[in-house]
Amino acid sequence: MQYTEGQLGRVFVVRIDDGEDMLVTLRQFIQDKGVQAGSIVFIGALKEGRMVTGPEEPVYPPVPHFVMFEGGWEVFGVGTIVPDKDGPHIHYHASVGRAGTALTGCLRETAVTYLVIEAVIYEITGLSARREFDEKTQLELTVLGNPGEGEKDGEAGPEEKEEHPALPEEKKEEKSELPGGLADIIRDLTRRPPT
């Protein structure tokens, strides 16, 4: 396991209209706004797209199983934004459904909007994260923490430590109500002063 910690930065709400490729539109928007790391959630519909629905066989390196879909498909999904050598890289996963058929996987290459898609982009600042090529999987994977950080004298870097600093008692109680980082994000959003 690896981890890194950051802070919630800007939040953008984006409407993508009929005929626009969601992948192209969001990539351009993220580059234009200078978002280097964050997450995306989106809902709406697609008229066509291409997705990887798992590997052909569960072997290393994986051979992706591509599926094309066309027509009006409802969609909801999430994405992560992590920098690579060329700037912000977006990794999308989504579920699409139409008339009792559903697909779930990694959106790739094209995702053309039908009617509208609404997306919310959460910028995360202060992260130590990057995408790097992984020899075993032959994929660009997210690596968390700074290269070489904490590796001298056999110590694990901060991203590999098992113990976490104690939280004040009030935060411990709040954190137990919701899983993982979701509680922290919701808490941060609800505590922000009005603008």
Where are these regions (language model features)?
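Intrinsically disordered, low-complexity terminal tails and inter-domain linkers enriched
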Residues: E151-S176
